[in-house]
Amino acid sequence: MKKLSFQQIILTLQNYWQDYGCAILQPYDAHVGAGTFHPATVLRCLGSKPWSVAYVQPSRRPGDSRYGMHPNRMQHYYQFQVILKPSPDNIQELYLKSLECLGIDLKAHDIRFVEDDWKSPTLGAAGLGWEVWCDGMEVSQFTYMQQIGGIECKLVAGEITYGLERLALYIQGIDEVKELDWNGQTGEKALKYGEVDFEAERQFSKFNLEFADSEMLLRHFKDSEEQCERLVEANLPLPAYDYCLNASHYFNLLNSRGIISVTERASYVLKVRHLAKICCMKWLEMSGE
């Protein structure tokens, strides 16, 4: 069987979960640290209405900046997120079948669910969870979402997060992300991951670690915090959540620049968590929950 390219992995997962009944959404157009931060997860996992979606989410973690020199750690990467609410009884079986669709022979490889309960301090979110290992390498995170914004979820959602780069490294048998086959073409049309993303990786690493203006970031954090609170008061939880995401990203940039102390870091986490909570509470209020 021909090894899937990076984009074929995405298309295969989209088709698989579409056939199951998920709506295929688009990435959220904001700086987020993981697919979980998409409002399709944070807000829609709350309340009593069923919700089944899947989407790719480009994600940023400034603290993982390596100037494009690390074989598998980047400040920008891609996740494929699946939310099944309520979580079906056979969710693990569904996940394993998705791996088979990607060409992974479950009988020939060691697939393990390693207990790893998940939490996001800035989102005030938590759930029972497992890392999924394939021959000793983590390729996915599996979580039963129980709390978001400090609010208990009425219906427990099953969240599956595929680490697309790690999955592609495994499927293609390659050691470095930049060498991944992006489009499955040959000759002049062939593209590697590095040709698509690694100049941006180099430049944004320099920005994240060297050029991000700390005073400006501090101002932007405070402005985002205040704007979020004003929008919640105005019954606009969706734009308010955008500013919560902005505040979270500015906090991550400040952290990557080494500007904030350990004590200050805890304070910033609480501030972002408060913003997430008031957005979630207002969303539920306006949804009639």
From Swiss-Prot:
Domain of life: Bacteria
Keyword Aminoacyl-tRNA synthetase applies: yes
Annotated keywords: Aminoacyl-tRNA synthetase, ATP-binding, Cytoplasm, Ligase, Nucleotide-binding, Protein biosynthesis
Group of enzyme by EC: ligase
GO cellular component, one term: cytosol
Catalytic reaction equation(s): tRNA(Gly) + glycine + ATP = glycyl-tRNA(Gly) + AMP + diphosphate
SUBUNIT field: Tetramer of two alpha and two beta subunits.
Protein name per its UniProtKB record: Glycine--tRNA ligase alpha subunit
